[in-house]
């Protein structure tokens, strides 16, 4: 939702669970809804972590949240969860050395940002984003940190970064 006092978005509700999304849990009074269903991509998942949903997106730091689609190469990140590690890289604007795949949405300081490297897909149409191509969608330009503008539904360009290693060749 938009919070005029905060000059941006505010998080109204967060649901973390395993399995399919139960849309009945959504109250229906929202402007944007970020949904990410995924398998945990941590180094090790134990029963306690599973029970508390530690590795369910979004990752949280203070009042900021990161949803990450992709996998950072094992041994290329510190900590237990690649998304937590990636979160630190994002907040430090240091994505050039991230070795792996990522397409992300970030809620930070009442704003929503989207970004991806060259390897992970991310598509958009107006205010809809998806890792799966859908009718009328265009590709989000890779290697750019984009800020979502709530009022105009356009993206404002932020900092640029490089894909560390792209195993694919795209001929011109």
What do these predicted regions represent?
Residues 1-172:
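N-terminal segments that mediate ammonia production and transfer
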């Amino acid at each position: 939702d938009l919070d005029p006092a905060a000059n941006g978005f505010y998080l109204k509700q967060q649901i973390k669970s395993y399995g399919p999304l139960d849309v009945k849990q959504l109250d229906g009074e929202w402007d944007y809804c970020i949904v990410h269903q995924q398998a945990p991509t941590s180094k090790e998942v134990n029963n306690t972590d599973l029970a508390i949903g530690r590795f369910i997106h979004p990752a949280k730091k203070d009042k900021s949240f990161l949803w990450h689609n992709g996998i950072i190469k094992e041994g290329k990140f510190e900590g237990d969860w690649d998304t937590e590690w990636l979160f630190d890289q994002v907040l430090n604007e240091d994505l050039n050395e991230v070795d792996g795949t990522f397409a992300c949405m970030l809620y930070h300081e009442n704003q929503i940002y989207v970004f991806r490297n060259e390897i992970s897909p991310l598509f958009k149409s107006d205010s809809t984003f998806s890792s799966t191509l859908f009718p009328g969608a265009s590709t989000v330009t890779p290697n750019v940190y984009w800020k979502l503008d709530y009022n105009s539904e356009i993206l404002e360009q932020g900092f640029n970064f490089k894909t560390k290693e792209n195993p694919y060749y795209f001929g011109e």
